[in-house]
């Protein structure tokens, strides 16, 4: 298209049909100017740019729908050019921006004009961008101008009723005046908006700011100032004076200059004025009034035409402020999801209060089971209303904290607070009134009436606060009201769901809630009633501690009861998600049947109808001329699909002959007919299919889905010529473009056992065989060898074939090696695979265009070259492919060659990248450019391609996490009305691309509008635009093993099953790829993603939230799918899980969640919560419940150990006596525990239901059973448990510390054994510590109060501890195990004399810096750590997770230890033991000893430093090693001493060990938070501590304080090292039985990779020297391993078998030794009242 401009030299500037209107009143508004612009004469202003600056295609085929339409275009192409030239010259835009926007606008006009008249095309585009009902500019205009007496919008209108206009009247006036615009004026406004947008760089993320800039620019453009030659704006004024100052403010919020370099500021989101804060300043007129120039003059005080020039004078730093504080706090969830907490906690209170009457019954006696007065029971339940009011009041208070009052659109909170305080007091008053009455008064009828009224009033409060959005608690704003327009337009403009969708939504949630509340009552709370009755009345007798006395141990039943309540409440939250999953799965399946998406369609019927459906659903259009019989057209499409599969080596030469349409002689002489493949018509289609396609092959899957998808309801399509233009956009950073031959045929590293090519041949044997046959055929043709196929069959030439089957070629020429590289690249996650797949759109468009336009052959006179040119023109007109290669200018040589190969293979591929001005000096500010090239760009002398466009940027656009910035950089280069967002590891197929017309029809914009968008009729019939269209993904890694299949299953359920029903009920958001985006809707609202660093790490979903809040619809189509790669390694998958979990935590802090959570209607709010945040909250609650259950188990086990337990029959009378006398009735607690375990088991098991249902519906019962059986055999439930913990931990850690970032995950095959040290360091914090702590508790519970149900807990906790090693390839290979053990021991003791990042101490310091942070200034020594770190966490944020949580665990673990040592039943007070002192001594002793050892070796290092000199570095290694090993021995001795003091009772010792761990955990966190300053970025302090060399470490003046800080570090490090040493060896010892199993490595590989033994990966090949060395390593370290194993057994087990208590002997002078446990039955004392 750029050729057009070359022929325009010498043409004059355009003659406008409108004279520019010059207002005498400088305060005239821009709307008035838009309305009253008069015709202007031609401007004689000198141009900075003229038409000779451009190269645009002027041929007649350029933009044919616009230029060659039957109706004359309202503005010609030359006129658009002249408009752009004039705008550029007057407003100071860049030349290349103008050229790019010209093509952008013309392609957009051509796309619209292809299906409607040019006038309608321009009118609808103007309505979409500027003035329409759903245009963002019009909404911004009314939001920011309407609420101030219409002074801005309508001040100068002549109508006398202007001042009293309502919003409805104002909107009508707007529409009337928009309709009166001339086409030229509309084109000016559209072009100006896109010029402003195209050059805005990061300001594109602030759409309302862009609207304001556009308004100022337009005011200036239509003024006389713009025509004044002497006052002309300088070149590139817009970038330098308008955009760059705003960009620099954004940049300054994130970066500061330190030591001459930009480094990221250490600020959390609440301290950063981000894109949204900037944008919200422009939402109101009061905000606009705060925009001040440097001389403190408000910008709005200037005449409108002067504002554009003075934008460069604005002090943006003084204008912008925070409009929402994203404090890292759990309080956001209280506000955002207050209705969830009200609904659950209030309902739980109703249930619990009703079932706990004994707790508020005066003088309750268990034998009498006396009931409270009815009034008390009614009002006790009614207290739920106070709870609901209090929770909602807290939500409003936290809203006050998060939304500053300075923000002009902040709502008034005092009416809500007044209401809530009133209802709170009204709900508390009856409780006080009734319970303060005497027992006699409580039986009065008046009290009963008060109680009943209170109960129903509380019910009203609970229902109201559960259903009503927080922002609508007091008063409602009608749609016609002019109040608070900004919030209504930009945060709560929710599209109403259809009647069907609303009905389904309410039915779904009514079903879920009814099932949940019924099940929760009978299964959870009612079963707790017996436990409440017995524990509430339980009074332990004769128990005491020497120091604490009897008070604490007598409170043990109440403590246990409080844990039961808390655990039951957490489970009460869990089952809501359980029912949501179940019910939504059923609804989704039913909806799928309604849509026709099911494998249950008769198989023969399904394939029999494929030809007919190809014609009716893919080919036939209403305006199609019937020239050939449908069979001819069908055959072209079907043969193209089959041939594409053959070219991809999915089917063989034999199979392709069976599947193609063939031309055969007809019965009539001289005629031919088409014979359809028997595949369609055979009576045994399924048998035929299995013969043609191998079982579970890719070809069978694709054909099956294609046939099934055509059975669905697909929108009617238009012709290819009338199809909208669209773009595929792929962001690329460092993903592999094309595999090199070295990567394919060489092992990845020394830990790899297989080359990539060998592994691919194992995964795709059929496709490899087809590829080899094809290559051999090509080689035979080139070598003129005849009969090679026969020789192969006869086995004559096997030596000739060997190289082909080995590496895919015999001759290592580039064309053959490239074929192998491409074959491998098309089966891995490469960019080449993505481009090859999505280029099928171009092939599909050509195919469809040729079939529907048979006259093409006549037009081209049968010339195949001209025919191809015509097809190429149509494909390029309708489809563009753009890859945003951020690093293209800095590619390595190999990457550059691969990119060049892509451009040569796909010349129409466009690459957008960021370039730097080569002429910039070292001291000058760099000029960065956004550049676009394609395969047609000529290659310059420097080897690079000449850019089509090179637009200077205001600065580096990569300010966030990268991906969204990368997309934003390239978004001006997309073309057309829609864009498909694709990742660089996806694939697509020809048969799916053929559906593109139907997909674009889902946006409901194919038919021309019946009325002008500015007419009243259009307003009445208007529907909200479709903003996003979601699509299915097939995870092509599902057959690569268990982990790949799990990832595929999650995508299958989440991205398909739930997305289907969520789109119907209005709860679907933009999950990512391969969704289609409505370009005009999204780019005018901030783009396709958000980009604030950290906060928007999951950038894709924000596009959905933008669309949902701003009036867009989000749909989902099931009949189209493309391929998607997923991470295949354990660590890589969990990195992705961590990114999703931390991203969700950031979403919870965002204003989008605040807006949606506080404004969505009830049913859509529930869908939004449980489909997104609810999943992660559920994972967190599961793990919290698990921890609570372990605390219940140890507290219950402590009681079971030392008290007599009553016999229990569940159906005995409530007043039955307890037997034997003096016993404690604890059996009901065990019964309740059984049901809780069953509940959690069901919650975990329910995770497989969606996948099972999805498989059942789409692939059949047999495939469902096979797939689930393979997953269960592969131990995938264990992986799911571990994943659940990673989700929960990443969410909690991010809300505590922050640090969310984009995690680049691996996209290769996980065949390499990961070292134990790496796995341990990666997962110890998130899971191993947590799992081991709970496992110790469960071991105690299993010893003291065994239940068979505990087996489930053992599986769960074992999963948390061993999953990283269970899913590590070749983890249990004998030799590799001990070689790895050697590396692990080195890792433990490494970096005590030299800097080594891969070490235990390095990992320990890295974990610690989440709390302490790094020092900002670097002293003397080069930093070892990265410069861009997350900010130091605030102590108030860490209080809950790092202080309060461990403190609670400490309390609930120490209490049972004290109780188990309190000797219940022993009435001899003289025999009381000092259990409390014992616990204190055993807890403090390790801390004191670690401090002594650390200080001793510090002094030793200082003393040895002068003696040894430079050798002190080496000596430091031994000092550190001795100190660490010595403290390991100290920890073992402490455990032995504890066992001795506990009388060698293993259960009591174990419980004491658990309590000590809790104390140490709390102490370590407390010391680190309270006493440690920031870390240095180098490791000098650690090295200096052991070597004594404190000088020269780069401490500066801090050398005086650093030893004291390091002393605290070393005190905690020695404790943590001992814990890690013991825990890691425990985990290694657990693997001992496994590594001794013969052939375990093969069995393990079958589980992981699903490779049969005959196709197992071979063991690595080593040299003789390497084998000898490995045998020596195995001998040494196997000896060490088993020696430590025996030592652990002897020291930690045998003493408890043979030891005897020394209590009461002369050695027990201080009563520290616990006597043997004796359960005492007392016939005179009762444990219950």
From Swiss-Prot:
GO terms for cellular component: 1,3-beta-D-glucan synthase complex; cell cortex of cell tip; cell cortex of growing cell tip; cell division site; cell tip; cleavage furrow; division septum; fungal-type cell wall. One of its GO terms (biological process) is fungal-type cell wall (1->3)-beta-D-glucan biosynthetic process. The keyword Phosphoprotein applies. Keywords: Cell cycle, Cell division, Cell membrane, Glycosyltransferase, Membrane, Phosphoprotein, Transferase, Transmembrane, Transmembrane helix. It is found in: Cell membrane; Cell septum. It catalyses: [(1->3)-beta-D-glucosyl](n) + UDP-alpha-D-glucose = [(1->3)-beta-D-glucosyl](n+1) + UDP + H(+). SMART domains: FKS1_dom1 (SM01205). GO terms for molecular function: 1,3-beta-D-glucan synthase activity. It is an enzyme of class 2 (transferase). The modification Phosphoserine is found at residues 23, 784, 788. InterPro entries: FKS1-like_dom1 (IPR026899), FKS1-like_dom2 (IPR056261), Glyco_trans_48_dom (IPR003440). Its EC number is 2.4.1.34. The chain crosses the membrane at residues 378-398, 416-436, 448-468, 503-523, 546-566, 577-597, 1180-1200, 1237-1257, 1337-1357, 1440-1460, 1484-1504, 1515-1535, 1550-1572, 1678-1698. It is a multi-pass membrane protein. Component of the 1,3-beta-glucan synthase (GS) complex, composed of at least the alternate catalytic subunits bgs1, bgs2, bgs3, and bgs4, and a regulatory subunit chr4. Belongs to the glycosyltransferase 48 family. Alternate catalytic subunit of the 1,3-beta-glucan synthase (GS) complex. Synthesizes 1,3-beta-glucan, a major structural component of the fungal cell wall. Required for the assembly of the division septum and maintenance of cell polarity. This is 1,3-beta-glucan synthase component bgs1.
């Amino acid at each position: 298209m750029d050729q057009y401009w070359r022929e325009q030299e010498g043409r004059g500037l355009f003659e406008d049909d409108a004279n520019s209107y010059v207002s005498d009143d400088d305060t005239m508004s821009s709307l008035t100017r838009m309305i009253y612009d008069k015709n202007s004469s031609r401007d004689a202003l000198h141009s900075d740019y003229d038409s000779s600056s451009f190269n645009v295609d002027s041929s007649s085929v350029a933009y044919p729908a616009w230029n060659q339409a039957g109706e004359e275009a309202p503005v010609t192409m030359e006129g658009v050019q002249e408009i752009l030239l004039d705008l550029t010259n007057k407003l100071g835009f860049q030349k290349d921006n103008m050229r790019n926007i010209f093509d952008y606008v013309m392609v957009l006009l051509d796309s619209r004009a292809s299906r409607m008249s040019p006038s309608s095309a321009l009118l609808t585009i103007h309505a979409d961008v500027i003035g329409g009902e759903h245009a963002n500019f019009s909404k911004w205009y009314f939001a920011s101008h309407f609420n101030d007496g219409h002074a801005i919008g309508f001040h100068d209108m002549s109508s006398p009723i202007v001042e009293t206009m309502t919003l409805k009247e104002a909107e009508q006036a707007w529409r009337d005046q928009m309709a009166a615009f001339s086409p030229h004026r509309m084109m000016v406004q559209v072009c100006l908006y896109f010029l402003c947008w195209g050059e805005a760089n990061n300001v594109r993320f602030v759409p309302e700011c862009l609207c304001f800039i556009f308004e100022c620019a337009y005011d200036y453009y239509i003024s006389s100032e713009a025509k004044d030659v002497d006052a002309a704006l300088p070149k590139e004024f817009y970038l330098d004076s308008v955009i760059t100052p705003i960009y620099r403010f954004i940049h300054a919020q994130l970066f500061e200059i330190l030591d001459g370099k930009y480094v990221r500021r250490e600020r959390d989101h609440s301290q950063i004025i981000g894109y949204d804060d900037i944008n919200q300043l422009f939402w109101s007129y009061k905000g606009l009034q705060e925009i001040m120039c440097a001389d403190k003059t408000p910008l709005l005080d200037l005449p409108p035409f002067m504002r554009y020039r003075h934008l460069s004078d604005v002090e943006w730093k003084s204008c912008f402020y925070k409009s929402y504080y994203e404090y890292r706090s759990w309080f956001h969830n209280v506000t955002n999801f207050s209705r969830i907490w009200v609904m659950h906690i209030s309902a739980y209170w109703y249930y619990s209060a009703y079932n706990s009457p004994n707790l508020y019954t005066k003088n309750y006696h268990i034998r009498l089971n006396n009931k409270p007065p009815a009034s008390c029971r009614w009002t006790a339940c009614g207290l739920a209303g106070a709870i609901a009011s209090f929770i909602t009041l807290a939500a409003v208070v936290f809203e006050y904290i998060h939304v500053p009052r300075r923000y002009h659109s902040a709502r008034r909170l005092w009416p809500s607070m007044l209401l809530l305080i009133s209802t709170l007091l009204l709900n508390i008053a009856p409780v006080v009134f009734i319970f303060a009455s005497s027992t006699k008064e409580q039986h009065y009828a008046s009290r009963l009436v008060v109680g009943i009224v209170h109960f129903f009033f509380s019910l009203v409060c609970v229902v109201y606060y559960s259903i009503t959005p927080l922002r609508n608690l007091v008063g409602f704003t009608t749609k016609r009201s002019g109040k608070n327009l900004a919030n209504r337009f930009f945060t709560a403009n929710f599209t109403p769901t259809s009647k069907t969708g609303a009905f389904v939504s309410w039915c779904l949630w009514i079903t879920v809630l009814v099932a949940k509340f019924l099940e929760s009552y009978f299964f959870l709370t009612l079963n707790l009633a017996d436990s409440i009755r017995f524990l509430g009345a339980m009074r332990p007798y004769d128990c005491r501690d020497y120091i604490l006395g009897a008070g604490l141990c007598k409170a043990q039943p109440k403590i246990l009861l409080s844990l039961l309540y808390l655990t039951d409440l957490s489970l009460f939250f869990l089952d809501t998600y359980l029912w949501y999953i179940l019910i939504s799965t059923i609804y989704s399946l039913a909806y799928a049947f309604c849509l026709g998406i099911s494998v249950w369609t008769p198989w023969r019927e399904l394939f029999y109808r494929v030809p007919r459906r190809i014609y009716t659903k893919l080919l036939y259009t209403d305006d199609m001329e019937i020239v050939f019989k449908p069979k001819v057209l069908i055959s072209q499409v079907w043969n193209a699909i089959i041939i594409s599969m053959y070219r991809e080596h999915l089917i063989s030469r034999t199979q392709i002959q069976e599947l193609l349409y063939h031309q055969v002689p007809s019965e009539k002489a001289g005629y031919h007919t088409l014979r359809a493949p028997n595949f369609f018509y055979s009576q045994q289609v399924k048998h035929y299919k299995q013969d043609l396609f191998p079982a579970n092959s890719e070809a069978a899957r694709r054909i099956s889905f294609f046939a099934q998808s055509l059975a669905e309801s697909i929108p009617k399509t238009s012709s290819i010529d009338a199809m909208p233009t669209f773009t595929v956009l792929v962001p690329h950073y460092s993903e592999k473009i094309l595999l090199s031959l070295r990567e394919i045929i060489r092992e990845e590293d020394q830990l790899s056992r297989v080359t990539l090519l060998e592994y691919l041949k194992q995964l795709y044997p059929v496709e490899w065989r087809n590829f080899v046959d094809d290559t051999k055929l090509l080689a035979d043709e080139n070598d003129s060898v005849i009969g090679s196929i026969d020789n192969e069959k006869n086995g004559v030439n096997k030596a000739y074939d060997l190289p082909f089957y080995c590496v895919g070629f015999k001759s290592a020429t580039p064309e053959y090696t490239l074929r192998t590289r491409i074959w491998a690249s098309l089966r891995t996650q490469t960019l080449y695979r993505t481009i090859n797949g999505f280029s099928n759109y171009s092939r599909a468009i050509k195919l469809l265009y040729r079939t529907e336009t048979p006259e093409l052959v006549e037009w081209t006179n049968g010339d195949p070259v001209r025919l191809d040119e015509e097809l190429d023109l149509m494909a390029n007109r309708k489809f563009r492919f753009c890859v945003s290669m951020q690093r293209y200018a800095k590619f390595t040589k190999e990457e550059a060659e691969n990119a060049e190969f892509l451009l040569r293979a796909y010349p129409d591929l466009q690459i957008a990248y960021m370039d730097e001005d080569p002429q910039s000096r070292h001291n000058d500010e760099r000029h960065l450019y956004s550049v676009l090239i394609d395969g047609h760009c000529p290659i310059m002398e420097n080897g690079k391609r000449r850019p089509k466009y090179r637009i200077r940027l205001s600065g580096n656009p990569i300010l966030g996490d990268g991906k969204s910035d990368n997309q934003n950089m390239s978004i001006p280069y997309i073309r057309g009305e829609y864009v498909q967002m694709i990742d660089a590891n996806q694939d697509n197929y020809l048969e799916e691309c053929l559906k593109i017309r139907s997909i674009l029809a889902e946006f409901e914009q194919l038919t021309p509008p019946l009325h002008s968008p500015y007419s009243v009729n259009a307003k009445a019939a208007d529907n909200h635009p479709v903003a996003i269209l979601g699509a299915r993904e097939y995870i092509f890694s599902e057959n690569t093993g268990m982990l790949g299949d799990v990832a595929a299953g999650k995508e299958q359920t989440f991205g398909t099953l739930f997305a289907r029903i969520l789109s119907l009920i209005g709860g679907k958001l933009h999950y990512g790829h391969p969704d289609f985006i409505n370009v005009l809707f999204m780019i005018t609202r901030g783009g396709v993603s958000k980009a604030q660093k950290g906060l928007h790490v999951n950038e894709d979903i924000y596009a959905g939230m933008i669309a949902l809040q701003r009036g867009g619809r989000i749909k989902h189509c099931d009949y189209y799918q493309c391929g998607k790669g997923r991470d295949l390694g354990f660590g890589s998958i969990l990195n992705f899980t961590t990114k999703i979990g931390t991203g969700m935590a950031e979403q919870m802090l965002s204003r989008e969640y605040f807006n949606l959570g506080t404004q969505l209607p009830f049913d859509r709010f529930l869908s939004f919560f449980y489909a997104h945040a609810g999943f992660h909250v559920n994972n967190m609650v599961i793990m919290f419940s698990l921890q609570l259950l372990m605390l219940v188990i140890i507290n219950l086990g402590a009681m079971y150990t030392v008290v007599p337990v009553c016999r229990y029959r569940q159906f005995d009378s409530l007043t039955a006596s307890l037997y034997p006398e003096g016993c404690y009735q604890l059996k009901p607690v065990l019964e309740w525990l059984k049901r809780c375990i069953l509940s959690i088991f069901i919650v975990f098991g329910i995770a497989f239901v969606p996948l099972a249902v999805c498989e059942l519906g789409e692939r059949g019962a047999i495939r469902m059973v096979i797939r689930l059986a393979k997953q269960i055999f592969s131990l995938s439930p264990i992986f799911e448990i571990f994943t659940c913990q990673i989700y929960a931990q990443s969410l909690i850690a991010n809300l505590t510390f922050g640090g969310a970032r984009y995690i680049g995950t691996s996209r290769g095959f996980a065949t390499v054994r990961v070292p134990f040290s790496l796995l341990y360091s990666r997962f110890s914090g998130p899971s191993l510590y947590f799992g081991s702590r709970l496992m110790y508790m469960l071991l105690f519970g299993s010893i003291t109060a065994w239940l068979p149900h505990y087996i489930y807990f053992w599986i769960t906790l074992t999963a948390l501890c061993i999953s990283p090693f269970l899913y590590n390839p070749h983890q249990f290979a004998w030799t590799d195990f001990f070689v790895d053990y050697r590396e692990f021991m080195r890792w433990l003791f490494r970096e005590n004399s030299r800097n080594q990042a891969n070490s235990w101490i390095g990992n320990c310091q890295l974990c610690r810096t989440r709390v302490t942070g790094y020092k900002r200034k670097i002293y003397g020594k080069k930093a070892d750590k990265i410069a861009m770190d997350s900010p130091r966490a605030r102590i108030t944020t860490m209080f809950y997770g790092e202080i309060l949580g461990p403190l609670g665990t400490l309390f609930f673990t120490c209490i049972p230890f004290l109780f188990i040592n309190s000797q219940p039943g022993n009435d001899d007070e003289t025999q009381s033991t000092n259990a409390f002192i014992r616990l204190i001594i055993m807890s403090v002793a390790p801390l004191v000893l670690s401090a002594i050892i650390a200080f001793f070796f510090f002094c030793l290092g200082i003393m040895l430093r002068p003696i040894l000199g430079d050798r002190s570095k080496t000596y430091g290694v031994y000092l550190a090693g001795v100190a660490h090993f010595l403290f390991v021995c100290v920890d073992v001795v402490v455990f032995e001493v504890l066992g001795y003091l506990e009388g060698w009772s293993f259960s009591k010792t174990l419980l004491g060990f658990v309590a000590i761990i809790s104390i140490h955990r709390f102490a370590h966190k407390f010391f680190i938070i309270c006493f440690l300053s920031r870390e240095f970025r180098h490791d000098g302090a650690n090295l200096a501590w052991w070597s004594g060399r404190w000088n020269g470490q780069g401490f500066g003046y801090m050398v005086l304080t650093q030893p004291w800080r390091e002393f605290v570090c070393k005190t905690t490090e020695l404790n943590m090292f001992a814990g890690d040493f013991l825990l890691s060896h425990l985990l290694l010892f657990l693997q001992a039985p496994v590594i001794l199993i013969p052939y375990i490595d093969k069995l393990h590989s079958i589980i992981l990779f699903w490779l049969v033994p005959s196709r197992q990966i071979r063991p690595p090949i080593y040299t003789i020297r390497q084998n000898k060395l490995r045998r020596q390593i195995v001998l040494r370290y196997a000896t060490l391993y088993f020696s430590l194993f025996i030592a652990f057994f002897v020291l930690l087990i045998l003493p408890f078998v043979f030891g005897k208590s020394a209590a009461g002997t002369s050695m027990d002078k201080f009563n520290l030794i616990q006597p043997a446990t004796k359960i005492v039955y007392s016939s005179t004392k009762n444990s219950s009242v």
